[in-house]
Amino acid sequence: MPVITLPDGSQRHYDHPVSPMDVALDIGPGLAKATIAGRVNGELVDACDLIENDATLAIITAKDEEGLEIIRHSCAHLLGHAIKQLWPHTKMAIGPVVDNGFYYDVDLDRTLTQEDVEALEKRMHELAEKNYDVIKKKVSWHDARETFVKRGETYKVAILDENIAHDDKPGLYHHEEYVDMCRGPHVPNMRFCHHFKLMKTAGAYWRGDSNNKMLQRIYGTAWADKKALNAYLQRLEEAAKRDHRKIGKQLDLYHMQEEAPGMVFWHNDGWTIFRELEVFVRSKLKEYQYQEVKGPFMMDRVLWEKTGHWDNYKDAMFTTSSENREYCIKPMNCPGHVQIFNQGLKSYRDLPLRMAEFGSCHRNEPSGALHGLMRVRGFTQDDAHIFCTEEQIRDEVNACIRMVYDMYSPFGFEKIVVKLSTRPDKRIGSDEMWDRAEADLAVALEENNIPFEYQLGEGAFYGPKIEFTLYDCLDRAWQCGTVQLDFSLPSRLSASYVGEDNERKVPVMIHRAILGSMERFIGILTEEFAGFFPTWLAPVQVVVMNITDSQSGYVNELTQKLQNAGIRVKADLRNEKIGFKIREHTLRRVPYMLVCGDKEVEAGKVAVRTRRGKDLGSLDVNDVIEKLQQEIRSRSLQQLEE
């Protein structure tokens, strides 16, 4: 009979099989009321599942991350329950958990309107407020199939036929008259599922295959309590205000159009930001001793077959042909960099060789996945590859890590999560090689006093990697930086150097990206700063404006002086009221507005206002220029008044 060991090390002895709910009741009624599921020997199980042998047990409640995920999964079933009541002929497909919520794909003979979604959410609340018990039944494959055949659930039948072994016992979850199939676990009672909201609908092909029927996907969010739900909805509201697509249009940074899906048309101001980022990155490339190169836009398919990309990545590659040869438009820069490395004999004395490129890449992303600058088909990578010996890995990774933090610093990201992905089951190379490589990455992180977590088995087959994830002001995660060891590609493309022993050796290749896609990073910055770019990045840094025509000459003279000082400046000599001009340039998020009236002309000064509405008073022109130059040169996040 089972001995149950709890997280605090205490044990409870039973003379019969028990469920997590039984143990929770044994501990106390308060815990039992809060119990959503259990973790038995590390595996999540339903609160009603019986434990027959000795086991470790942790009770899962809504306070646990797993508990919240279970609530969301059960809300997907609740959605199914409600939609079958409103539209009984609906066929249910799949309803998984996603970040912050859930969705369900349904086959419905009507296109859901906003009114339909509101009615569906209302019915979900009515059902949840009944606080009914969710009943789990393990049945044979044949019984499960018969259940769904009788209910006309063709997609569930297809899942059983194609994905579940005949000797398996699927779990059926009964929500009153509604039945769904799932691995589980799920909440024991719907009292846990009161705090949710349906968010939107979209189209989705069955099994993600465009040859299959288009279904309707209903998205929802769910939380453990009302406070968390409201906080999330407020974050969404703030995110909508910061949406880079909206701000990009307001500030005339770029546009996209149907004739070039996923490709960016950069306007002057947006391209100014892009070029300033390039200048910044180039300054760091020089500091960290990189060569800058430029590879071709496309290369023969034969090369991509050698690298393995054709076998594993061809669906994401654009191709073209000429004179009976097929070419691939590059989705990444690494094969081209190996070709540059291969030109001329290399010695160990030439290593490490650090090669960087602002590489123009293209990937055939699904049209439904495209999203402004965040998910595009054409993008520029701040990509680099380091060719080195095994003995140089640690020092090179160390330098990469320093460079990553050095480059993130001017943008003010306060939270950076670092993960080290280790060897997968399927991999190349010896265990000794992986031992050393993983140790080199870990030690490099430790030497830089960077906390990190392991992602066991999540490395690529050709080497371990470090991932850097930025969290923005809304606590959204953006995975940008990567340091990836590669023991495969150099040998596939016959890269070699002559070692100290005069023998040919294959170099180790380190893939290194910091900003990632330049387009995506500009999208991230646009939302992080809500369009209030720091002065060094702002497309227009200063606007000089007159109050009446009599100051026009002084404005032009001052504008020229600012231009000569390397400041991006515009003159506004329009015959408009000064309040109108100030408001317009404030909405354009111009960092500084210099107002010139008769007093300023007479004193050789200028009245300085900021886009945040602060009046800095009348200041000496040369002092203003000097302070602006210092702010821009230092790439400061702070403005003069701050």
UniProtKB/Swiss-Prot annotation:
Q: Which Gene3D superfamilies match?
A: 3.10.20.30, 3.30.54.20, Anticodon-binding domain, Bira Bifunctional Protein, Domain 2, Threonyl-trna Synthetase, Chain A, domain 2
Matching Pfam families, A to Z? HGTP_anticodon, TGS, tRNA-synt_2b, tRNA_SAD
Q: What is its EC number?
A: 6.1.1.3
Entry cofactors? Zn(2+)
Q: According to the UniProt record, what class of enzyme is this? A: ligase
- Which PANTHER family does the entry link to? THREONINE--TRNA LIGASE, CHLOROPLASTIC_MITOCHONDRIAL 2, THREONINE-TRNA LIGASE
What protein name does the entry list? Threonine--tRNA ligase
Q: Which organism is it from?
A: Salmonella paratyphi C (strain RKS4594)
- Which lineage do the record's taxonomy fields give for this organism? Bacteria, Pseudomonadati, Pseudomonadota, Gammaproteobacteria, Enterobacterales
